Design a protein with these regions (language model features):
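A glycine/threonine-rich phosphate-anchoring loop and its flanking beta-alpha core
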Residues: 116-215
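Buried hydrophobic packing segments
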Residues: 111-115, 180, 258
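Short beta-strand/turn micro-motifs composed of small residues
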Residues: 44-45, 103, 160
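Residues that form or flank phosphate/diphosphate-binding pockets in enzymes
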Residues: 52-53, 109, 168
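Solvent-exposed alpha-helices and their adjacent loops that cap or buttress functional pockets
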Residues: 11-12, 35-36, 91-94, 115, ...
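A short, small-residue-rich loop immediately preceding and capping a beta-strand
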Residues: 92-128
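ATP/NTP phosphate-donor binding region
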Residues: 1-98
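Active-site segments that bind and position negatively charged phosphate/pyrophosphate groups
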Residues: 205-258
Length: 258
């Protein structure tokens, strides 16, 4: 199993999701799959994410002699709606696969939903440090032009290729940092709900969320420069706040009035 590389030494993580962040994400993914006897893969990406990471992942999988089917969703803007979900489900058929999501939020949500509904696992290969939803069980979808969240599953493992994350568009890096900044209000909202309406609350998880926020704000200059140190902090913070939601069983630790 690939180790969870954590910058937050005091974290109490109840969810056993192997997470790797570094320059050897694809070799680590291959090792993880070897150890887990995984040898059939459905690789889901869009044209951009396939070019920056998906093609390398496909080559590495084929080099092992494993079966891989690649689904490249093509459009200027891929949306997690019926059109793209059906494309993935048609490619998957009724066979057993390990799905691999190569992308950021939308690709991950499509893959999360489709893998869950076909009773398969999925692995996440993030391409941008833009959202905290990589570790989530929820899949925000657009159904009949209305946004809804379907309950699905977290990834079996996450392998974050640091050079790819550093090369992500700056607006996506900024979005990820904005997502982290929102935790200040989400924790305030959560505490207010606990005080006024006796909502369920967990102080340890709240502290974990705020520690992730503090670590990222302390390194804002490095994040703005898209340095490896800064982006490693940011993606780890996003993973950590996502895990806080997963561990608590609700989005309260990281989502509120913001």
């Amino acid at each position: 199993r690939s180790p969870r590389v954590s910058l937050f030494k005091e974290s109490i993580v109840q969810t056993d999701i192997p997470i790797y962040i570094g320059e050897k994400a694809i070799p680590e993914m291959i090792r993880y799959c070897q150890e887990g006897n995984r040898d059939r893969f459905l690789l889901v990406s869009d044209e951009n994410t396939h070019a920056v990471l998906g093609a390398r992942a496909e080559v590495a999988i084929r080099a092992q002699g494993w079966d891989v089917k690649t689904v490249v969703l093509s459009d200027e803007e891929v949306i997690a709606d019926e059109e793209y979900i059906v494309q993935v489900l048609l490619a998957a058929g009724r066979e057993e696969w390990t799905y691999v999501a190569v992308g950021s939020g939308t690709i991950t949500d499509i893959t999360r939903f489709c893998s869950h509904r076909t009773r398969n696992d999925f692995i996440s290969l993030p391409t941008a440090p833009s959202v905290d939803g990589y570790t989530s069980i929820g899949a925000p979808l657009v159904v009949r032009r209305v946004k809804t969240t379907a309950l699905a599953q977290p990834p079996a493992a996450i392998f974050a290729d640091l050079p790819t994350l550093c090369a992500a568009p700056r607006e996506m890096i900024a979005a990820g940092f904005g997502d982290i900044l929102g935790k200040s209000t989400s924790i305030a909202d959560w505490r207010l709900g606990a005080l006024l309406w006796d909502e369920p609350y967990d102080e340890k998880i709240a502290r974990r969320t705020l520690r992730a926020l503090q670590t990222c704000t302390d390194d804002v200059a490095e994040i703005a420069q898209a340095s490896e140190a800064g982006i490693a902090r940011l993606i780890e913070g996003l993973f950590e706040t996502g895990l806080c939601m997963l561990d608590f069983g609700q989005t309260r630790p990281a989502s509120g009035s913001e």
